[in-house]
Amino acid sequence: MLQSFTGSHLFVLRTFVGNELSVFSPVTDGDVRRVLSKMPSKPSPLDAVPITLLKSCADVFVAIIVRLANLSFTEGHSPARYKKAQVMPLLKKSGLDSSLPSNYRPISNLSTISKVLERLVLVQLRPHLLGSVNFSEYQSGYRTGHSTETALLEVLDSVYTAADDKQLSVIIGLDLSAAFDTVQHDILLNRLRVEFGVTSTALSWLTTYITNREQYVKVGQQSSSTVHLTSVVPQGSVLGPILFAAYTSPVGDIIKSHGVRYHQYADDSYISRCELPTLLPDYLFWQTAQWT
């Protein structure tokens, strides 16, 4: 939840207004078939049953997945066996020094069944989050009809508006390094409950989804030992991006309180026409509170 900040501005707790999301509704054969049909056929090294077989033998597997999903949603419990990721480091581009870990991008592989369950949840969770007044209207990531183009248009519009008013434009790009890896679970879950009205078994499902996750690294034929993750929204997941957007939603309130224009795409924020001496300390203070 939002906290009090030092300096000239005070940020208060945002509360949810509307109908709570207390349970994920049961899914049908048709729901699962639609999800499977839209999923890419790229195999996962963690799959006991490859995605191509799930698709080609849907008449056999759909009923099993429906039963698994509905039992999971009813109990508010994300299956533990689908919470392990295999991470493969990929060199960001050819020619980079392969001995430096910073030159690699971690590619996280999750099981196909995990992604099926996540997509079934996303169908219900996304409209609930986006329909809340607490979800930033200036976030172009993860929203239907929005993209990097809408983010760029918003930034350009702020520049042109300033030019029309004969004002100088200053644009600041704020990027969070390894942001998905440092999300504090207690803050995220509290924000979902208090600010977005996710409660009861729906919140329990999301709690078990993001907590007690594991991963290991594989390079060639060698695999590391498995490590337990304590602060993360899953890389390579379906739900990770929208959960991260909810986690960082208060950024908009902080920026708007200074009377400036801003726009976001995923974990990138762009600020224009701002009062730097007061805005940046508040922004950095909030970031420190969320990621330490």
Give names to the regions the model predicted.
Residues 46, 50, 57, 61, ...:
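Hydrophobic (often cysteine-bearing) scaffold residues that line and stabilize catalytic clefts
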Residues 1, 32, 36, 45, ...:
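Mobile genetic element proteins and their domesticated derivatives, centered on retroelements
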Residues 121-139, 164, 241-277:
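Active-site palm subdomain of RNA-directed nucleic acid polymerases
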Residues 42-49, 87, 99-109, 150-190:
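Conserved catalytic palm subdomain of right-hand nucleotidyl-transferase polymerases, strongest
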Residues 178-196, 270-292:
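Catalytic palm subdomain of template-directed nucleic-acid polymerases
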